[in-house]
């Protein structure tokens, strides 16, 4: 439509160049929905994400020390979510102003970088929680060795650095360009570099999403098989129910936030590379734009994990909100997600090598 003056190239934030196909140049469609959907959804994520994660950080820092390994992972997850939601006001303005970016190229690069940094750090922190939980349920002795808070802290630092290192090329791909009086902040890159960007993005997706997703599914599959096997003369313990809640929340975050975004983004890239016809490009572009807010919504869903799995976290949160009596702080955090089977017995020693656990036979678990 001439009134919208919105071609596929404009909707993608691109201008004609050596990498543009004739299909893209000739395909026109209305994308005004984006200028309502994205500002509104990002505003909701900003309000909810900041409102949920800022108090969470405060509780972790001032009320929930000392941390166990799981609390360490959750703190870094909340920190990642908070950093991301603080960048959303610029995107809210950008889409509300119909793709006009007045903040400069450097901030454009940083905001686009921060989106993927949060996305993949969240994926890896959730994977760390999943592996940690798996070890506690299925291999309690190994959990003694690998579940130390210091090791968890080093692993979190490695996650931040590895994800940042993998995404450094994104700082070079993403840029701004002018369209008349409008300044665009590209979500991908220039048309002439799009092929290279797809190769880079696909490698990052496989390494930072595909592998962690597979590891998480395997861990939770093995955990669920063990947890759902009945124990003679024993009801399901609270620790087992907490484990099942953890499985449900993490899988929900993956299913709602991460999987749809990566599937639609892959189809979107393929449609452009294969020069699909206008109707297909139209549909794919709309679906891809719709799933972007879902990827951001993990910043709002992650705090649900803290509520469902941390008894001490819930108590401290009630106190922060004005309800409940103060509880004495103890060294053992009930945020710990490593729990041994109900009918296991352990002898704790100064070192993991000297500790031992006796668990039921495999045919009874």
From Swiss-Prot:
Keywords: Cell membrane, Disulfide bond, G-protein coupled receptor, Membrane, Phosphoprotein, Receptor, Transducer, Transmembrane, Transmembrane helix. One of its GO terms (molecular function) is G protein-coupled UTP receptor activity. One of its GO terms (biological process) is cellular response to ATP. Disulfide bonds join 108-185. SUPFAM superfamilies: Family A G protein-coupled receptor-like (SSF81321). One of its GO terms (cellular component) is plasma membrane. The keyword Translocase does not apply. It is a multi-pass membrane protein. It holds the Pfam family 7tm_1. Changing residue 333 to A: Greatly reduces agonist-induced desensitization and loss of cell surface receptors. The chain crosses the membrane at residues 35-61, 73-95, 113-131, 155-174, 197-222, 247-269, 288-309. Its main location: membrane. Gene3D superfamilies: Rhodopsin 7-helix transmembrane proteins (1.20.1070.10). The modification Phosphoserine is found at residues 333-334. Phosphorylation of Ser-333 and Ser-334 is a key step in agonist-dependent desensitization and loss of surface P2RY4. This phosphorylation does not involve PKC, nor other calcium activated kinases. It is found in: Cell membrane. Residues 1-34, 96-112, 175-196, 270-287 are extracellular. PROSITE patterns: G_PROTEIN_RECEP_F1_1, G_PROTEIN_RECEP_F1_2. Residues 62-72, 132-154, 223-246, 310-365 are cytoplasmic. Receptor for UTP and UDP coupled to G-proteins that activate a phosphatidylinositol-calcium second messenger system. Not activated by ATP or ADP. PANTHER family: P2Y PURINOCEPTOR 4 (PTHR24231:SF21), PURINOCEPTOR-RELATED G-PROTEIN COUPLED RECEPTOR (PTHR24231). Belongs to the G-protein coupled receptor 1 family. This is P2Y purinoceptor 4. The lineage of its organism: Eukaryota, Metazoa, Chordata, Craniata, Vertebrata. The gene is P2RY4.
């Amino acid at each position: 439509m001439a009134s919208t003056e919105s071609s596929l190239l404009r909707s993608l934030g691109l201008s004609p160049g050596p990498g543009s196909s004739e299909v893209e140049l000739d395909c026109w469609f209305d994308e005004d929905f984006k200028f309502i959907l994205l500002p509104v959804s990002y505003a909701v994520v900003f309000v909810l994400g900041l409102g949920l994660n800022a108090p969470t950080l405060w509780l972790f820092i001032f009320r929930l020390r000392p941390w166990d390994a799981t609390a360490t992972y959750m703190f870094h997850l909340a920190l990642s979510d908070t950093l991301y939601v603080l960048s959303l006001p610029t995107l809210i303005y950008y889409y509300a102003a119909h793709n006009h970016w007045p903040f400069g190229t450097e901030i454009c690069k940083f905001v686009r970088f921060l989106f993927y940094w949060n996305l993949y750090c969240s994926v890896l922190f959730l994977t760390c929680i999943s592996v940690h939980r798996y070890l506690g349920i299925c291999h309690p002795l190994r959990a003694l060795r690998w579940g130390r808070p210091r090791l968890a802290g080093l692993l979190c630092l490695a996650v931040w650095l590895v994800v940042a290192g993998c995404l450094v090329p994104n700082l070079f791909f993403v840029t701004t360009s002018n369209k008349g009086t409008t300044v665009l902040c590209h979500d991908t890159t220039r048309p002439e570099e799009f092929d290279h960007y797809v190769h880079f993005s696909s490698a990052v997706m496989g390494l930072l999403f595909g592998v962690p997703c597979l590891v998480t599914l395997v861990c939770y599959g093995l955990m669920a098989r063990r947890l759902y096997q009945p124990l003679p003369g024993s009801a399901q313990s609270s620790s087992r129910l907490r484990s099942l809640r953890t499985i449900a929340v993490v899988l929900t975050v993956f299913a709602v936030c991460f999987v749809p975004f990566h599937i639609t983004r892959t189809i979107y890239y393929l449609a452009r590379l294969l020069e699909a016809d206008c109707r297909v490009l139209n549909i794919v572009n709309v679906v891809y734009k719709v799933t972007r807010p879902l990827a951001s919504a993990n910043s709002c869903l992650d705090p649900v994990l803290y509520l469902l799995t941390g008894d001490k976290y819930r108590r401290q949160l009630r106190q922060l909100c004005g309800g409940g009596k103060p509880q004495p702080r103890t060294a053992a955090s009930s945020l710990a997600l490593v729990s041994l089977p109900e009918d296991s017995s352990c002898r704790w020693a100064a070192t993991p090598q000297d500790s031992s656990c006796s668990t039921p036979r495999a045919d009874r678990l």
